[in-house]
Amino acid sequence: MKAAELRKLTAEELKTKLVEQQQELFNLRFRHATAQLENTSSMGDARRTIARIQTILKEKE
């Protein structure tokens, strides 16, 4: 998700998205460990999205 799209969301929506992304990253790590993940770059994408959300949450404080 782009940062501009994330900035339009409220703090509560961002927190919800953050939890969803953290769960997605957990699932990706699990699939990677069990050799079921074909596209490993999706783990990096998830980490970057989490970082974007956390940064925008700090900006809104």
Curated annotation (Swiss-Prot):
This is Large ribosomal subunit protein uL29. Keywords: Ribonucleoprotein, Ribosomal protein. HAMAP family: Ribosomal_uL29. Belongs to the universal ribosomal protein uL29 family. One of its GO terms (cellular component) is cytosolic large ribosomal subunit. It comes from the Bacteria. The keyword Transmembrane does not apply. The gene is rpmC. Transmembrane segments: none annotated. One of its GO terms (biological process) is translation. GO terms for molecular function: structural constituent of ribosome. InterPro entries: Ribosomal_protein_uL29, Ribosomal_uL29, Ribosomal_uL29_CS, Ribosomal_uL29_sf.
